[in-house]
Design a protein with these regions (language model features):
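Catalytic machinery of carbohydrate-active enzymes
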Residues: 1-305
């Protein structure tokens, strides 16, 4: 059986679609699955089972990238096509059965997938390999708490100020020096955030894995105690690794994109989403200031204890 799954360009949406992939892997364990996803998200499938091919969609002008994918997939008669992008591509490919995701509003993205496709899409899953887990375990010490911290994001208005992250981590360290902060994000985010977030914190309490692959980051998440970060793909990755997750929200919709899972928590700005929707947001400015250091600290202490 040959299955084609057309995923999102975005890391977060692709992580949220891993429940779809899990469903087909479980239902058809002998199937050969081809993935189409964006270049940043494609590495999420590095360790997935049932893989036949992985195609990276690198955007081109006038949507010409779809022609590249078309010519790579047109000669195959697919048993199942799952189109999570509602693209035209799936209408031009031979198939026996087709699932096309149709977005809804006001419910979580996972529930949208489940309702639209007609099966349970909630079993988020990221596969890590033995080497990745060995590397993570080597730095995870049993006598310490380990907090994954993601201070970045792809949109400045939803990023909590780095100075507040630093103050919050200092406060945590002062209350319990048996804690290690695992800093995650891209190599570019390392340049932007590493110095300021780690100021006045002993280097032995910092584990810097900025720039590591998504699956290596996931391996660290699987052996850690808690995640704190902005609304982001790495926040969804944390949920997929079954790590307790606290996420900070302001001008984005936590009802749709909040951390999936019963034990996970959203800390919102004092302003609600309607407030932000009425504003002409400055793309170079954070709108997360009304979330206080103490507010985040108290929630972290509650979860870590």
């Amino acid at each position: 059986m040959k299955i084609l799954i057309i995923c999102s360009n975005l890391v977060g949406d692709t992580v949220l679609s891993t429940g779809v992939i899990s469903y087909f892997q479980k239902k058809y364990p002998e199937s050969l699955i081809t993935f189409i996803a964006g270049p940043k998200a494609i590495s999420l499938f590095n360790n997935s089972t049932n893989i036949d091919q992985i195609h990276s969609v690198k955007k081109k002008k006038f949507n010409l990238h779809w022609f590249d994918i078309y010519f790579k997939t047109i000669k195959i008669k697919w048993d199942i096509i799952v189109d999570l992008r509602s693209s035209l591509l799936s209408y031009f490919l031979a198939n026996k059965k087709k699932y096309i995701f149709k977005k809804k509003t006001n419910i979580h993205h996972i529930l949208q997938l489940t309702q639209s496709l007609g099966f349970d899409c909630s079993n988020l899953k990221i596969d890590t390999n033995e080497l990745e887990e060995k590397i993570a375990k080597k730095q995870i010490k049993s006598d310490f708490k380990h907090l994954i911290v993601f201070p970045g994001g792809n949109w400045e208005p939803k990023i909590w100020p780095i100075e507040k992250y630093n103050k919050m981590l200092i406060k945590l360290y002062q209350s319990n020096n048996k804690i290690k902060f695992i800093l995650v994000g891209s190599a570019e985010e390392k340049k932007d955030y590493l110095f300021n977030i780690s100021k006045n914190i002993p280097s032995e309490n910092i584990i810097d894995i900025f720039g590591e692959s998504l699956t290596q980051t996931a391996a660290y998440m699987k052996f850690s105690d808690l995640f704190i970060g902005n609304d982001s793909g790495l926040m969804h990755l944390s949920c997929a690794c079954n790590l307790k997750t606290i996420s900070l929200f302001g001008p984005t919709d936590d009802k749709i994109y909040g951390p999936w899972g019963k034990e996970n928590i959203v800390i919102r700005t004092k302003e609600n989403l309607d407030h932000f929707n009425k504003l002409n947001l400055d793309e170079k400015k954070s709108y997360m200031d009304t979330i206080t250091v103490d507010q985040v600290y108290q929630m972290l202490i509650k979860f870590l204890n």
